[in-house]
Amino acid sequence: MSVWAFFAFFSLFLSLSVRGSAEQCGRQAGDALCPGGLCCSFYGWCGTTVDYCGDGCQSQCDGGDGCDGGGGGGGDGDDGYLSDIIPKSTFDALLKFRNDPRCHAVGFYTYDAFISAAKEF
């Protein structure tokens, strides 16, 4: 029984002492700037929406009304060179079981969502 108590205590100690901090910018990340001119949110995350560039924005802001450039890459459905790098056929081959009915995330991983997310970097 004491082995289990030790294991439980040790696990609790590790979980409390090893905190996963993944902030990307600002005071939370040693005053690092976001790549591509993205805004750094109050909480230390990079992005282009008002959540990142609005009140509390730490760096690369334009006064809280949006961002001053960088990031995302346009709308209009034009994915530019990304579709040349990773065409839909490659995406389908990499994630060929993503629409398996046994999976909980059926339909979640789409090519368009992937391209949209990739354009943010």
Swiss-Prot record:
Catalytic activity: Random endo-hydrolysis of N-acetyl-beta-D-glucosaminide (1->4)-beta-linkages in chitin and chitodextrins
This enzyme's EC code(s): 3.2.1.14
SUPFAM superfamilies according to UniProt: Lysozyme-like, Plant lectins/antimicrobial peptides
Induction of the gene: By wounding.
Disulphide bonds in the chain: C25-C40, C34-C46, C39-C53, C57-C61
Residues that span the membrane, as ranges: none
Pfam families documented for this protein: Chitin_bind_1 (PF00187), Glyco_hydro_19 (PF00182)
Region Catalytic, residue ranges: 78-121
Keywords: Carbohydrate metabolism, Chitin degradation, Chitin-binding, Disulfide bond, Glycosidase, Hydrolase, Plant defense, Polysaccharide degradation, Signal
InterPro entries (UniProt xref): Chitin-bd_1, Chitin-binding_1_CS, Endochitinase-like_sf, Glyco_hydro_19_cat, Lysozyme-like_dom_sf
Alphabetized CDD domains for the sequence: ChtBD1_GH19_hevein (cd06921)
Record's signal peptide: 1-22
Single GO molecular function: chitin binding
Family: Belongs to the glycosyl hydrolase 19 family. Chitinase class I subfamily.
Protein's recorded name: Acidic endochitinase WIN6.2C
Organism of this sequence: Populus trichocarpa (Western balsam poplar)
